[in-house]
Amino acid sequence: SHTFFMNNTEEFYKFYRDKLIVKGVKPNKAHIALAKLEEKGKLKAVITQNIDGLHQMAGSKNVLELHGSTLRNYCMDCGKSYDIDYIENSKGVPKCECGGIIKPDVVLYEEMLNDDTITKSVQYISNADVLIIGGTSLNVYPAAGFINYFKGSKLVIINKAATSADKNADLVISEPIGEVLGSLKTVSYTH
């Protein structure tokens, strides 16, 4: 939480370095398929709650990260940006050259989502012809409520477990998203 970060910053960073900085992780088949769909002009945006940067690693360009990214960090005083390597290699609480505390650019409990990211996400969803929702239980708000802005013709849900939106979907695929999107022949799509 934001309160924990502010009151126990050193302990926060111990946990953060141990559990949230994951080196060597690679995009899966779903990340790669989405990047290929975007490259072919079939996908306008990826809206994600993930904070790992894997969509960008796979090649997606238009990624809206609702909860931020562990790959970006900033000084709380002057705003200077720092990459994940700086955080990983620093000792204790990472400090900026100005002396300010560096914070990961992730949304912690008690913090608001970025207004610009919300606005863009709602615009993409409300203008979409087809909305594919995948790999989410649709239980985390406010992101789960974004589905209410969809006015297009086809809603597709890809998730291992049932979601509250399944009854409104045109297609529900109850399989892991990596397997489903990984099986698409995205290379054969034409304009």
Tell where the protein language model's regions lie, with residue ranges:
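Conserved catalytic core of sirtuin-type NAD+-dependent deacylases
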Residues: 1-189
